[in-house]
């Protein structure tokens, strides 16, 4: 097989070299023809410039319609080609869409079938009741995390995975086949099978050729031997016996038969060699086509992977830009608002607590001040009473009277909300003085 591949590669290289030489010679010949045609057209243009100028009006009038019709026809052809390509693309899209939907339905059906089989197996398996004791006697609860439970869960998931793989095997095969159909690798696989069949046919043809060559050489040897025996008999023709005559006749017949067989084998060998050459040429062409198609397929897959990578990078870049320009500021504002809301709530709660504490403290202080004021008033009342009980001198009474005058001077007759404290003696003096003054005024008036 290695020698066969080596021969095939050498044959392909020779063909490529021959084709390259042919292309080179055709290129040189075409280039020479092109140069001569350029020179010829240049001379023709130089000689016919006046004719072009004289016929310019006719071209502008009559040729414009022709060019316009050609342009319209070209546009119509382009539209038809575009429509045909669009229809072909729509057909391919609908075909691949139906294949995708079919594969998705197959996957769903396979998963449902795997779940059904797994549920049936779990229902049939059961658990040994003697090995399922998990009660904690000291606390009355359930003992969890036993190794048997973990092992049961592991086995359950492994069996489920096996069911999924078994059920999805056909779906995966059909999906891979559909992918190969989409990418065109199925045709390459058919071409590989054709190459394998051609190699097998070539091997069979080589074995048949080898057998034919052996038979052809044997027929030649038989013919040579029969001719030698005939020549030996002809040399002693004068002394033939009846047996020699029979041998000569038989040898002559055998020689004719051997000659005919040799000719038939030669013809068959020539046909087989031509068939082998044809199969070899087909094999060379198939291998070259396979390498060429695989190269195109790999380039297409590589190009698709590169573009898909670029698309993913573009999507990631777009998402990054969207995230940085819109989502991150929105998230930041949302966090700031939430933080401000929390801070405001906490500050309001703290302010309410402080206000409540301040009100309680203020109430306590007012209560204490009220109690202190009451105590002071009681003490003052006791002092006044004690002073009233004591014998008073005229100087003391005169001092009280001066204090009353000072308080009266501090009072403003226009201010009705002013407050002043008077003790009992001062009130008595005030009433007495008012009575004396009023009596004096009445006497004066009367």
Curated annotation (Swiss-Prot):
Pfam families cross-referenced by the UniProt entry: She9_MDM33 (PF05546)
Gene Ontology biological process: inner mitochondrial membrane organization
Places the protein is found: Mitochondrion inner membrane
Keyword Transit peptide in annotation: yes
Source superkingdom: Eukaryota
Keyword annotations of the record: Coiled coil, Membrane, Mitochondrion, Mitochondrion inner membrane, Transit peptide, Transmembrane, Transmembrane helix
Transmembrane portions of the chain: 306-326, 425-445
UniProt topological domain (Mitochondrial matrix) ranges: 446
Keyword Amino-acid biosynthesis: no
GO cellular component, one term: mitochondrial inner membrane
Side of membrane Mitochondrial intermembrane, spans: 327-424
InterPro entries referenced in this protein's UniProt entry, alphabetically: MDM33_fungi (IPR008839)
Coiled coil: 186-285, 344-390
Topological relation to the membrane, as annotated: Multi-pass membrane protein
Function: Required for the maintenance of the structure of the mitochondrial inner membrane. Involved in mitochondrial morphology. Causes growth arrest when highly overexpressed.
Assembly, per entry: Homooligomer.
Family to which this protein belongs: Belongs to the SHE9 family.
Protein name: Sensitive to high expression protein 9 homolog, mitochondrial
